[in-house]
Regions:
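Active-site cavity-forming subdomains of large catalytic enzyme subunits
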Residues: 1-6, 31-45, 78-84
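Core alpha/beta catalytic barrel or barrel-like domain that forms the active/cofactor pocket
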Residues: 1-29, 46-73, 88-107, 124-145
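Composition- and surface-driven signal marking solvent-exposed, interaction-prone regions
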Residues: 34-35, 76-77, 102, 112-114, ...
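Generic recognition of well-ordered alpha-helical segments
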Residues: 41, 87, 120-124
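Non-catalytic terminal/interface segments that mediate subunit docking, oligomerization
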Residues: 71, 77-86, 96, 185-189
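Conserved phosphate-binding loops in nucleotide/dinucleotide-binding enzymes
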Residues: 73-82, 109-115, 149-150
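Flexible, glycine-rich loop/tail regions that form catalytic "lids" or insertion modules at the edges
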Residues: 111-112, 120-123, 127-189
């Protein structure tokens, strides 16, 4: 955003066209809060940091994919439950589009049956669960609100760290995000 604005573009000319890709993992409550925090932070950044006036610039548009890394080969049918919970967290967090992994992807390419179940998972959530009837079904939940606030605070601190390095381009030049990705990958393993 900063580079585009420095080049003379108006934030409201490009921000409404930006979209993002997220992954959703197994911690249901944390994942819902993550998406809610992302939406709040995006609106804040667009309004307060970049001065966006168009309400569409304040809206975070994002696609979500369930986390293939969470799928297990030993009992692949249990992955149906994992994917369902992840998909539900994404929907309750406000995703605009969703990809649900097939339960057998830990073993290789998905079978036709597994792909059909992944599709039916989305259809049941959208058409039978009732959660899509609400804009923010979990808004007001103490647990969700507290987690959302914690995530917003941590992300704000992280953004401040990047700003202190001179912005994202400078941070990349210094290897900061690369080191962070390596560190988190090591911790995850």
């Amino acid at each position: 955003g900063e580079a585009a604005i420095a080049a003379g573009l108006d934030v409201d000319d490009f921000a409404p066209r930006l979209s993002f890709f997220f992954n959703v993992h197994n911690n249901f409550m944390e994942e819902v809060a993550k998406f809610r925090a992302a939406r709040t932070l995006w609106a804040w950044i667009m309004k307060d940091k970049f001065g966006a006036k168009n309400p569409k610039s304040h809206m975070l548009r994002f696609h979500t994919q369930t986390a293939g890394v969470t799928l297990q080969a030993q009992q692949p049918l249990v992955n149906v439950v994992r994917v369902t919970l992840q998909a539900l967290a994404a929907v309750l967090g406000g995703t605009q589009s969703l990809h649900t992994n097939s339960y057998d992807e830990a073993l290789g390419l998905p079978t036709e049956e597994a792909a059909r179940i992944a599709l039916r998972t989305q259809q049941v959530i959208a058409n039978e669960s009732g959660v899509a009837d609400f804009i923010d079904a979990l808004g007001g939940s103490w647990a969700i609100e507290a987690l959302t606030e914690q995530i917003e605070t941590k992300v704000g601190q992280y953004f401040a760290k990047i700003d202190a390095l001179g912005g994202m381009v400078k941070a990349i030049e210094q290897g900061f995000p690369q080191k962070e990705i390596e560190r988190r990958a090591y911790e995850h393993q």
